[in-house]
Amino acid sequence: LIKKTILTRKFKEFAADKYEIRHHAVIPGPGEKAVYAKILKEFCEICSFYFTSTGDAKKDAALRLVRQIMLMIRACSTPNTLAGYDGEPFPRKTRYIANLIKTEIPTKVAVGCTTIEAMNMYTDYLGLMFPERPLFTIHGEISFERRQKIIAQFEETADGILVCTQQALKSSTNIPSCDDVILESLQWNIPKMEQFYF
């Protein structure tokens, strides 16, 4: 029985209350709301701009709702890159996260993005807002050795900002000196997300 039994535990079971997860609600601006409305009301007309047809009308119809949800998730992260956006150069969530870093996180912080597009946007914006703070970027196309060097440089700073894709830094990477992690967008898979911030 012992050879065939595997005990699993969740991080929270042995970490207890050593961490705090806070959720922040950000009210979207008019330009962002316009993008959301366009996706909800005119998806059939704009679908071909974002997704390639399978060549089979039945498959395309079956995928329509999933694709609409995928585009809505993308719009919640980077609405300024989609058709119909008419607003500030950077969405409100980007500005909210920058203000959160400015007012509440004077030390190291990691910002985890779900897409490279979002990572590039946050890198650009946080670079503009915090020119005095060291800024580091990691994504999946960077080799593991290079990632380790970037993390070592980040560890040496007192107030560095690390912007990365959530998939690029998972459980195999440990940054013990960074106590603050911001997820700009949630993933479908909660355990994968937990691999990033734990």
Model feature map: region roles:
Residues 108-115:
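Conserved RecA-like ASCE P-loop NTPase motor core of nucleic-acid helicases/translocases
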Residues 106-108, 159-160:
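Pre-Walker A (Motif I) flank of P-loop NTPase domains
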Residues 34, 95, 120, 124, ...:
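Alpha-helical elements of the RecA-like P-loop NTPase motor core of helicases
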